[in-house]
Amino acid sequence: MDWVMKHNGPNDASDGTVRLRGLPFGCSKEEIVQFFQGLEIVPNGITLTMDYQGRSTGEAFVQFASKEIAENALGKHKERIGHRYIEIFRSSRSEIKGFYDPPRRLLGQRPGPYDRPIGGRGGYYGAGRGSMYDRMRRGGDGYDGGYGGFDDYGGYNNYGYGNDGFDDRMRDGRGMGGHGYGGAGDASSGFHGGHFVHMRGLPFRATENDIANFFSPLNPIRVHIDIGADGRATGEADVEFVTHEDAVAAMSKDKNNMQHRYIELFLNSTPGGGSGMGGSGMGGYGRDGMDNQGGYGSVGRMGMGNNYSGGYGTPDGLGGYGRGGGGSGGYYGQGGMSGGGWRGMY
């Protein structure tokens, strides 16, 4: 508890709100309610944060009925949901609003330092012209209690940018052509295998090259380092491999060290998962078959009416990492009309 108190903001900033970190990426609001069983949460009091592509960040805000209840909630710090231990920090509604005020660079104004041209090197997660937040629906995910988002805003400004060295490694080492990380290659080339390993505990200065070297002699084909709303690395990353077997082999590196940090790995791959460009050209890294609305964050996809459309999709495209609201009509990080690579539906 002393650790929790030292790593939280001043007492007068709290209004009964806490921030959770380390949630399982398929975590639902119902699971959070169960985690805090016996502690009263206000209506519309749970916000599952997403990045601008509609993917879960593994964090959430929970507003309790009083400051006293929120203080009791801090006592559950380091308890588990599923296989993940949960970190809990004191927060406030103003902090939630700060995360979800749409940044100017997403609205077509002056680009920020992490925004890159869609068709150029490093454009993979840079916000393109016309990209928008997927708005969070109040009371979504089928939970009748009405827990929902805050001010209907989407999620973190989760930007990434390419690294020339990693581009060269991918291009030269695998003969893929185009631009490896953030590339503008042909979307039908089979470049996207849909086999991922999620990394947690990275040194905050870790680069794509560091991650590629960590998995040597395996060769990842894509690395995405998570960037938080403050423009800093979160210590997490997603790494794509060509085959399920490569992704499984990469798990042998679980708990190995990178510099002074030991790295936790989580497998997000299934045997036989294919590339995500099937069906009607819907999004991203979806797996298996026509009309798969799943995939890795459903990039560039409009809401198609099913409640669970987000990435790390199972073969039927339901559930998982980053949920989209049923019939929301929102875009999950749509690329510009001239965008290259796999960025999804144009």
From Swiss-Prot:
Return the SMART domains for the record: RRM
Q: Residue positions of the PTM Omega-N-methylarginine?
A: R174, R287, R323, R343
Task: Give residues where Phosphoserine occurs.
Answer: S216, S298
Q: What range(s) does the RRM domain occupy? A: 16-93, 195-270
Keyword Acetylation tagged: yes
Q: Which InterPro entries match?
A: ESRP, hnRNPH3_RRM2, hnRNPH3_RRM3, Nucleotide-bd_a/b_plait_sf, RBD_domain_sf, RRM_dom
**Compartments (UniProt record):** Nucleus
Query: What keywords were assigned to this record?
Result: Acetylation, Isopeptide bond, Methylation, mRNA processing, Nucleus, Phosphoprotein, Repeat, Ribonucleoprotein, RNA-binding, Ubl conjugation
| Gene Ontology BP terms | epithelial cell differentiation; mRNA splicing, via spliceosome; regulation of RNA splicing; RNA processing; RNA splicing
Residues modified as Asymmetric dimethylarginine are R121
Mind telling me which PROSITE patterns this protein's record contains? Answer: RRM (PS50102)
| Glycyl lysine isopeptide (Lys-Gly) (interchain with G-Cter in SUMO2) crosslink, residue number(s) | K6, K67
Q: Which residues carry this modification: Phosphothreonine?
A: T314
Q: Which SUPFAM superfamilies match?
A: RNA-binding domain, RBD
The terms describing its cellular component in GO are: nucleoplasm; nucleus; ribonucleoprotein complex; spliceosomal complex
Please give the CDD domains that the UniProt record associates with this protein.
RRM2_hnRNPH3, RRM3_hnRNPH3
The protein's GO terms of the molecular function aspect are: RNA binding
| Superkingdom of the organism of origin | Eukaryota
N-acetylmethionine modification sites are M1
Please list the residues that carry the modification Phosphotyrosine: Y296
| Functional description taken from the UniProt entry | Involved in the splicing process and participates in early heat shock-induced splicing arrest. Due to their great structural variations the different isoforms may possess different functions in the splicing reaction.
Q: What is this protein called?
A: Heterogeneous nuclear ribonucleoprotein H3
Taxonomic source organism: Homo sapiens (Human)
Record gene name = HNRNPH3
